Amino acid sequence: FAAMKATALNLPIDNSLGFAYVLPYKDNKKGITVAQFQLGYKGVKQLALRSGSFATIPNATDVRDGELISRNRLTGECKFNFIEDAEEREKKPVIGFVSYFKLLNGAESTFYMSKAEMEKHALRYSQTYRSANPKVKAASKWTTDFNDMACKTVVKLNLSKNAPLSVEMQDALKADQSIM
């Protein structure tokens, strides 16, 4: 069923493309391994693009030390002063992740999570990342590609909380990381 979900969403299952994945998931209660559908970062962006509602494609980036100027937890508004020099920016530690989109009607949304908030999210939702087995944890996408997973997460959460969602996008977000 996991592969059928990707097909229904017209998203290719190919690790090199990053649209959708079918991953093994150990169901400890039943003692079996089952297929899990996982929506990729490019898949999230592709579905948003297909909706025709966006003036700018939802995007995300890491936030480096000194770049976050202010954050209003009530309105979600954030102000940033991004470091333009790539080499200088790389020297600074990552402190968080931010997603942004603008709709055709002019509405905009920015969604920020600190690195600590993202770490909690990863531990809560990733079975492999919270594994006591060092080999299992080392193989987790959250271990090998933390920044990519974090960027996907802020885009997904920004869309699910703040964007008008097409039926296709609602279905994809609901199915993401579900056992099929």
Residues of each region from the PLM?
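Single-stranded nucleic-acid nicking/binding segments centered on His-rich, glycine/basic loops
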Residues: 153, 163-180
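Binding-interface segments
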Residues: 1-165
